[in-house]
Amino acid sequence: MAANLFAPSAYTAALLLYLQKNRFLLPLNNVLEMGIGSGVLLASALQLGARQATGVDIENAAVEATRALLIQEGLVSRAQLGQGDLWSAAVVQGQTFDFIISNLPQFACERVPVDGHLPSWSAGGTDGRDLMNPFLSGLHRYLSKNGRAVITHNVFLDFESTQQLIGKNHMTARVAQSVSVPLPSNKLNCMNPHTLKRYNGHGVKQVGGNWFVDFDVLEITWS
């Protein structure tokens, strides 16, 4: 059941493609995935040559789903997993990471029950930044000197707001790839209607009864 709760999404697929295209970055590196979900990205990083990997999720079900996947793939000996709230998780304390991956909940919606998903699914608060802001604010303490973070970043988050936030800690972001994906009805129905209206025609598209939303894969490095 836990594995179904965290089924990989189009956002996962975009990060997976990034890992595959940039596999030269992974060998010998210490990798962190913040918000592991199904564990697919963490397992893929190890398969592509990461020396070791750490995974964090606030949901214990995600930690257990990831552990099961790593055991299945014969990778668990090179990984450490922990339940926790972003950077407060015990498993990341005292560490820095060469490569950090993250696909955090980032839609402008609150924690509500959705069929087939936990209440935390996609819930980024009124502006979508409830998790993104503390993640980005703490990133500089855990990213190694020559390290790189790669994250999904949808249109609701506003790229300039992210640049300003990480710029305070001498970091910068660039768009590595852009994707447009269907916006399913269960996600659409839980979104802040004012935010949805604001971005309609500006990263959100409606064609008949179909909705689509744009997101980027961002690379974050030291400036």
Which residues does each predicted region cover?
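Glycine-rich, phosphate-binding/catalytic loops in enzymes
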Residues: G49, G116-P119, G167-K168
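Class I S-adenosyl-L-methionine
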Residues: M171-L218
